[in-house]
């Protein structure tokens, strides 16, 4: 039986409820009166439930889809303005005991080069990332209790936070590791992590068990209930995601919205972020061998509907996607992107040799961080390296209340400008700096509070003179 307040995976992600939802959506995909009513509800910026959102996903009326896209763009601006948060992944180890059939880290892959970073190598990687201008990392590691125990992850986090190279600093470490215990989540919380991220991969239990035939990840319930344990362990911010292409996308979409509803119902806080990866080629993995791939237009529609269904969430897209796709979905709802990503273990400090490939997936957007920052500004966006909310305690329900009320912009907009100024001073090319200085000058005038505007302008002048790390 479906119960969004239950702590049992098969009750808050209930297969029967999802199938009934998809049937309801099919029956109403041409019901324009109902569709208009749902779109009108979405205009209130309070979100949609999984049934309402699924009806819009099934809708094929071009006029209504255009309305959905326009609304998604406006809602994104209302909650997040024109800011795009920048981050980079850091792969610590590709040792893994699981048998996931879509991931080259699977245990049976005998020709991938296995690698685990030492603390000295972590330091070298972080310095390389700082020298690009990154302030926010998402650390990744395969599941292996011998090679990658929680103690190793904690040591890496400590090392990352300890490094201050020139004007560089990693100010927020997000963590994407396998489902674990409440005790271990408490340790991650104490280590000062930002968001705990865990992709569900697929919400279809039967498919999940087939795609994860061996290893601890085979346990669907343990994996699906991980976010509840993380929040019980004191982690305020969690990030959801599915790997689109493994199962029917409409099933996955309904499950994703249901998971967000569950977190809100039980913990009073929905997902801090939702990621939208699509399966990509990697080592011995061919995405064409999976039958549920989605085209770019369907992908864009999913992104738009996540934005209007869960309006407060940060939406993340990686360099799995091309420049063209990223440009489209940023407009429709994405608020965080990676730049200059390396999906290998190591690779930032020294590019790896071809015969030592350790990548989890192939990258589609190979531009430098400077090129990505320049491109975003040319589109009218503000690249943000801000980590202030995490460092000022604006996490969990406190962040959500500020975000839902729109008050978060009073902090985020000036913080974005100040961190962009840092980037321009320390890392940008001459062309990027010229574009950025003009953008900051223009955006300063948009800060509505005169006192905040003056303080921001003062801090930007101080950054010009060598000071760093101001925040509201």
Which residues are covered by each model-predicted region?
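Short glycine-enriched, charge-decorated loop/helix-capping segments at active-site entrances
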Residues: 211-217, 288-292, 358
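Generic structural signal for well-ordered alpha-helices
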Residues: 88, 126, 154-161, 185, ...
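Canonical Radical SAM [4Fe-4S] cluster-binding loop centered on the CxxxCxxC motif
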Residues: 80-121
């Amino acid at each position: 039986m479906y119960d969004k307040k239950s702590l049992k995976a098969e009750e808050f992600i209930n297969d029967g409820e999802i199938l009934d939802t998809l049937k309801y959506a099919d029956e109403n995909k041409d019901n324009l009166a109902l569709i208009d009513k749902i779109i009108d509800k979405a205009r209130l910026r309070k979100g949609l439930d999984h049934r309402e959102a699924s009806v819009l996903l099934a809708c094929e009326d071009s006029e209504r889809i255009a309305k959905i896209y326009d609304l998604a763009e406006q809602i994104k601006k209302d909650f997040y303005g024109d800011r795009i948060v920048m981050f980079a992944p850091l792969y610590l180890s590709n040792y893994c005991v699981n048998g996931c059939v879509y991931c080259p880290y699977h245990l049976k892959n005998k020709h991938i080069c296995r690698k685990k970073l030492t603390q000295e190598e972590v330091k070298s990687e972080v310095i390389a990332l700082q020298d690009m201008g990154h302030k926010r990392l998402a650390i990744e590691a395969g599941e292996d209790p011998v090679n990658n125990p929680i103690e190793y992850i904690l040591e890496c986090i400590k090392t990352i936070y300890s490094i201050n190279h020139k004007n560089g600093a990693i100010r927020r470490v997000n963590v994407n590791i396998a489902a674990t215990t409440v005790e271990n989540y408490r340790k991650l919380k104490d280590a000062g992590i930002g968001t705990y991220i865990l992709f569900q991969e697929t919400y279809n239990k039967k498919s999940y068990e087939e795609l994860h035939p061996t290893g601890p990840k085979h346990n669907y319930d343990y994996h699906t209930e991980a976010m509840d344990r993380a929040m019980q362990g004191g982690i305020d911010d969690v990030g959801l995601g599915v790997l689109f292409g493994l199962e029917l996308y409409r099933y996955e979409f309904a499950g994703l919205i249901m998971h967000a509803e569950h977190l809100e119902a039980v913990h009073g806080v929905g997902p801090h972020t939702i990621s939208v990866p699509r399966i990509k080629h990697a080592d011995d993995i061919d995405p064409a061998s999976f039958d549920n791939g989605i085209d770019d237009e369907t992908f864009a529609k999913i992104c738009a509907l996540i934005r209007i269904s869960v309006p407060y969430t940060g939406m993340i897209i990686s360099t799995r996607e091309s420049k063209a796709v990223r440009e489209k979905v940023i407009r429709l709802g994405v608020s965080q992107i990676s730049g200059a990503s390396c999906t290998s273990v190591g690779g930032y400090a020294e590019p790896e040799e071809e015969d030592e490939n350790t990548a989890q997936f192939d990258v589609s957007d190979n531009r430098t961080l400077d090129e990505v920052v320049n491109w975003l500004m040319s589109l009218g966006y503000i690249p943000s390296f801000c980590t202030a909310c995490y460092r000022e305690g604006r996490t969990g329900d406190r962040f959500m209340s500020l975000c839902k009320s729109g008050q978060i912009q009073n902090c985020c907009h000036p913080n974005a400008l100040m961190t962009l100024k840092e980037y321009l001073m320390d890392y940008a090319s001459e062309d990027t700096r010229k574009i950025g200085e003009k953008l900051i000058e223009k955006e300063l005038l948009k800060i509505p509070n005169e006192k905040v505007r003056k303080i921001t302008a003062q801090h930007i002048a101080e950054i010009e003179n060598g000071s760093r790390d101001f925040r509201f």
